[in-house]
Design a protein with these regions (language model features):
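Conserved C-terminal helix/tail region of periplasmic/extracytoplasmic solute-binding proteins
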Residues: 373, 384-396, 405-474
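Conserved N-terminal structural module of periplasmic/extracytoplasmic solute-binding proteins
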Residues: 2-114, 127-132, 173, 178, ...
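Alpha-to-beta junction loops
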Residues: 96-109, 210-213, 294-302
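Short helix-initiation/N-cap motifs at beta->coil->alpha
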Residues: 82-92, 191-195, 279-294
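Extracytoplasmic/periplasmic substrate-recognition and gating elements
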Residues: 77-79, 313-381
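Glycine-centered hinge/linker elements that transmit conformational signals in sensory
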Residues: 200, 244-283
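Extracytoplasmic/periplasmic solute-binding protein
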Residues: 146-152, 157, 194-250, 297
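Hinge/lid segment of periplasmic solute-binding proteins
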Residues: 108-169, 173, 321-325
Length: 474
């Protein structure tokens, strides 16, 4: 903050002139006034940006960004709409029925599967700042060589862990980890499912000694939490299966390869947990956040986007680290974090031309101005794929980047973007909860084994069924 008492009137005047010049430069250069988009300097006569934001946790920040953009661009018109969680596509489908001056101009798809649904609305981004500001243009989703969607954030997920709790555990007699002071970090000690299970089982056995409720946070099946398992955890067996079978793109069918490895890691989550399986159906994402942030659990499956919630709940940045999710696959000691994006921006080609131009002007400012870069990288905590962006002020992003940078580590691809439908995910989710509840009589009881067999059929046979349904539509 500038302190007025320490500056002379002349210095203040100079600063005011500099600020005005910078704002003017941003408004007339960096904000997209170029022949490429046919913009003009009379912004009040221009179009409107209607941004359909996908991430509810960033709603207030996007409103701030819109207000700041309007403040330094008198006459600019921008509206941020944020559908409720799990209703994005339904609300978007309704919104694009509006006339061209009122329909969304900037919206999100989740990758190739989403593009198949929305390709009739996606504009060619060849001349858009969204595409031209990418640090690696190969990240864009293309159709016949034309960029149609651009990832605005690359994210990582894995097992977030509490460093302070693991350090306390490592100091216990006969613990399964050595203190990091001995020269080997926790993430370099836990590099396989076998080691993770050994540590988690011992943490659970000694939970009273450590003052925790369990090794893992609750695997809640409320809609605020279940996506962590039906989508992100399910990615792990699919990734190894696709890698083994050299699958590219979306397959019409899958196999049973590695599905039982899915069971191994999920069993660990629910047996070494803060919560009995009988309560999982109502446990929420917020419950898991608080269990972890308050030191009641050591491990929490989530991603880099979770830092805001964790920080707001009181955990310190120096107390968090991240491990890959191990499932007992051969060669997993070389595995990095699950890294990718299901967050692609598209410009709506059915919106009016003036609204598309206004949207490109807004994006130019967002991706090149200091304020826009700070909003994306720091306030929203995104690891962005655009040119000349600062590192995100997010310890989970840094932990993931540092781990994946280790020699020989291979990031796990987000193949879940090829899942055939939400119906497939929901069927897997329902059967996964049924299985969890069946384990009350033992992880390998007859009821649990039967429930798992049902899930495997939903996983494999359901994929082929949902793929046929999705691709039979004209």
């Amino acid at each position: 903050m500038w302190k007025g008492s320490m500056m002379s009137r002349s210095v203040k005047s100079i600063i005011a002139l500099v600020v005005c010049a910078v704002l003017a430069a941003c408004a007339f250069t960096a904000f997209g006034f170029s022949k490429s988009f046919g913009a003009n300097t009379d912004r009040s006569a221009g179009g409107k940006v209607i941004f359909f934001n996908f991430k509810p946790e960033g709603k207030d920040i996007w409103i701030d960004v819109a207000n700041e953009y309007k403040r330094i661009n008198p006459g600019a018109d921008i509206d941020v709409k944020t559908p409720q969680s799990n209703s994005y596509e339904d609300e978007l489908r309704d919104a694009v029925k509006n006339n061209p001056d009122a329909m969304p101009t900037l919206f999100q798809i989740n990758g190739p599967v989403g593009y198949a649904k929305w390709k009739d609305y996606t504009a060619d981004l060849t001349n858009s700042p969204l595409y031209n500001q990418l640090s690696n243009k190969g990240l864009a989703l293309t159709d016949n060589g034309k960029p149609v969607a651009v990832p605005y954030v690359t994210e990582n997920y894995g097992l977030i862990y509490n460093k302070a709790l693991l350090a306390r555990y490592a100091d216990l007699h006969n613990s399964k980890l050595k203190p990091e002071e001995d020269g080997v970090s926790f993430e370099d000690q836990i590099t396989t499912f076998g080691k993770l299970k050994e540590v988690a089982d011992d943490l659970q056995k000694r939970k009273d000694e450590l003052g925790i409720d369990g090794a893992f946070t609750s695997a809640g099946f409320d809609s605020s939490s279940d996506w962590r398992f039906k989508t992100h955890l399910a990615n792990m067996p699919l990734y190894y299966q696709f890698t083994k079978n050299k699958v590219n793109g979306q397959p019409s069918s899958i196999t049973y390869d590695y599905v039982d490895n899915f069971r191994k890691i999920f069993d660990l989550y629910i047996s070494d947990s803060t919560t009995p399986v009988s309560q999982l159906s109502t446990k929420t994402g917020e419950d898991a956040v608080y269990e972890f942030a308050l030191g009641k659990a050591v491990f929490y499956q989530n991603g880099t986007w979770a830092w805001g919630d964790l920080a707001n709940s009181g955990i310190k940045s120096e107390d968090v680290g991240m491990l890959p999710i191990y499932i007992g696959a051969k060669g997993e000691e070389k595995q990095g974090m699950a890294t990718g994006s299901e967050n692609y921006w598209c410009i709506n080609k059915r919106a009016s031309k003036k609204n598309q131009e206004a949207t490109n002007e807004f994006l130019q400012c967002l991706l090149t101005s200091p304020y826009g870069k700070d909003a994306l990288a720091n306030r929203l905590g995104f690891a962005t794929p655009f040119k000349k962006f600062p590192k995100a002020d997010n310890p989970l992003v840094q932990a993931a980047v540092d781990y994946t940078a280790k020699e020989g580590k291979v990031p796990v691809t987000w193949v879940f973007v090829t899942m055939p439908s939400n119906g497939w995910k929901d069927d897997v989710d329902s059967d996964l909860l049924t299985y969890a509840q069946a384990t009350k009589d033992g992880m390998t009881s007859m009821g649990a084994n039967q429930a798992w067999d049902t899930l495997k059929k939903a996983f494999v046979d359901g994929w082929e069924k949902e793929y046929k349904i999705a691709h039979s539509k004209s």
